[in-house]
Every structure is written in C-alpha cells, then in structure tokens.
C-alpha cells in the first residue's frame, strides 16, 4: 500500500526507531508512547486489521505471539514485572492506522479499564 505509513516503515521508506526486525515483522518504538516501553509490532506484509488475517497467516500470528513478544519483553526487561499487549481493530476499537499492529506496553502499572 503506497500510502500506508507502516508499509513505508517496513520498507525503510520512513524513519522509525527499530528495536527488532526479522523476515516477517518489524518492531519499533511508538512516536507517542503511552508507557515507558511502548513498542509497535507490525507484519512486513500489509494486512489491514486483525479481521483480515487469513488461515495462511497462522505462522505470522504465532510468530508474533509466541516468539517476538516474549523476546521483546525479555529484552526490554518487562517480562517479570508485567506488560500489556493491545490490538486495536476498527474505528470503535481505536485503530488509527489501517495496518495490523500489536502494541507492547510496559514499564509502569497498567490500569483497567484502559479507556
């Protein structure tokens, strides 16, 4: 998607503070952090939202949840104190960029409800 900012970040056409990258995903610091550690994890391939994941995306989803998030939580030293993972989906869900992304937040106590 030529106008998708996250596609531009994934393709290194836009600047970001990358903390981790592999063949499937890129993870970078949020430009408007809501916690001391606020990382966005995005697939390199354009997927509009969680609702657009297909059965052939199982490996990608599993990789993010089982490999990438635990690795980042460990690297950021938030795995023992706790963290939150958020996926905003659709307008009412608070999704502001139409590219699937996972928020990893930590480094402070999280409250409920989130707002």
Language-model segment annotations:
Residues 1-115:
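HIT superfamily nucleotide-processing domains
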């Amino acid at each position: 998607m030529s106008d998708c900012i996250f596609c531009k970040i994934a393709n290194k056409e836009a600047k970001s503070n990358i903390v981790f990258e592999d063949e499937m995903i890129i993870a970078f610091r949020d430009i408007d952090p809501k916690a001391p550690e606020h990382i966005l994890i995005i697939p390199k391939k354009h997927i509009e939202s969680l609702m657009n994941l297909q059965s052939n995306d199982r490996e990608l989803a599993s990789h993010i949840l089982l490999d990438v998030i635990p690795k980042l939580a460990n690297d950021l030293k938030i795995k023992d104190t706790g963290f939150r993972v958020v996926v905003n989906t659709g307008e009412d869900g608070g999704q502001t960029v139409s590219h699937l992304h996972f928020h990893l937040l930590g480094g402070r106590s999280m409250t409920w409800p989130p707002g």
